Amino acid sequence: VRTWYHSWRAAIRIARRDAWRFKGRSFLVLAMIALPILGVSAMDLTIRTSELTASESLDRDLGRADAKFTDPGLGGVPILQNPDNTQYTPVKDYDNEPWPDGKADVTKAIPVGSRVLTDTTGNGKLRTKHGLLNTRIHELKAADPMAKGMLRLNSGHFPEKTGEVAATTHFLETSGLRVGSKLTARSLDADYRIVGSYELPNELKADEVNALPGALLAPLDKALKADQLPGTDPSTVHLLTVPGHSFTWNMVQKVNTFGITVDSRTVRMHPPAKADIPLYQKSGWSDGRSEGSDVTVLASAATVIGLAMLEICLLAGPAFAVGARRSRRQLGLVGANGGDRRHIRAIVLAGGLVIGVASAVVGSILGIALTFALRPTLENLTGQRFGSYHFRPLELAGIAALAVLTGLLAAIVPAINASRQTVLASLTGRRGIRRSSRVLPVVGLIAFLLGAAIALYGSTLTDQFAIVAGGSAIAELGVVALTPALVGLFGRGGRWLPLSP
């Protein structure tokens, strides 16, 4: 063994052989390290998959339309909005005047040459096998290519005639009806045939029926008002495709002068600079983003990961120590044949490296498989469909690297202890007389009290999660240092305890 490369190569071969020889211990350590990696990698892939891309989100909101016009009910006064249409306000300040109210004329804002598809929603009570069910009524020509992606057909077909409706899968499960059943509404004599089932990707648990424009809401609203009951409260938005299929930010601002908000595909895919957004120039308005919240999330994640790694190291370390003790004759032979302390440490550390790499591979593969297996269940729990699978190689590699690092850290102390043994003690198996340290319990007690104080200070007087993590780690290491003294103390106190039955 002359070079660093050959030294570590031989150490890894020895460690791999020992890991295969002692399968039970190796599997125990592998499981302790791989389980957290499994959970974190599955969580990472699940979170990334649940985060829709801009294109996926637009398909659910706009279908294949270029823009969506919405009347905010401000009476048609000029307004300002942000690019993603989540914030808007009148251009004029109404501090000392009544707030504008009323409907705007959407038709005046529609560009020449546009193709328009109306999208109207209202509410009504529909008769089911279990009684009346308050249901959202969605009037949209869902079979139109412009609406593709907003509603996902599961069976049958979307309405093609006035007397046909489609219903969400959740509505059919709740109502006890099925495709082919007749559907009626309170106060309305007309019957409708359910011709298909569908789902809303963002609202899997929505009770909704779909009909052609004017087929259900208008007659139902008229019948309810005739019976002196609350109407369907319909609201309409307009989906548009424009020549060139590009609804720019300038076009959005022009439509805003008619008191209409716009959700534009082009603007959401390519938002303008903050300086070009008049809304953000007004006092009290901003994009609402906070860098501090991102820092807090990262700090919290780092704290949890750091403490988890410490726990795993403390749990897996004794297993490596036991392995090194069982292999002390083998390590003694290495020393007897010219190996020095560096080679002994390398062999024990290689055991941690081998187990760490195996844990990284097993944990990552099982985490990805778990994500695939649990996806339908998670979608039902969250009530929305995930997007396509988004693998982040750097993130998954970083998670796997944590397994390797944890294995190495867990093997450091056993490696140092093994390298300190003499060749004679290793070959004969004699450990000699070992006295417990009187300094270690004192250091442990001081570390525990200091760590607890730091963690308490960090959690109550500051917002620094790193302080909490550091204090917790110091306190935990203090408890570890106190453990031999505590075991001895309880052992001496056991003489006064009765015998177990």
Give short role names for the model-derived ranges:
Residues 318-320, 329, 353-383, 396-420, ...:
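Small-residue-rich transmembrane alpha-helices
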Residues 257-278, 315-326, 356-372, 403-406, ...:
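Alpha-helical transmembrane segments of integral membrane proteins, especially early/N-terminal helices
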Residues 17-24, 342, 346-359, 367, ...:
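Alpha-helical transmembrane segments of multi-pass membrane proteins
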Residues 280-291, 371-394, 456-475:
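Short juxtamembrane loops and helix-capping segments at transmembrane helix boundaries
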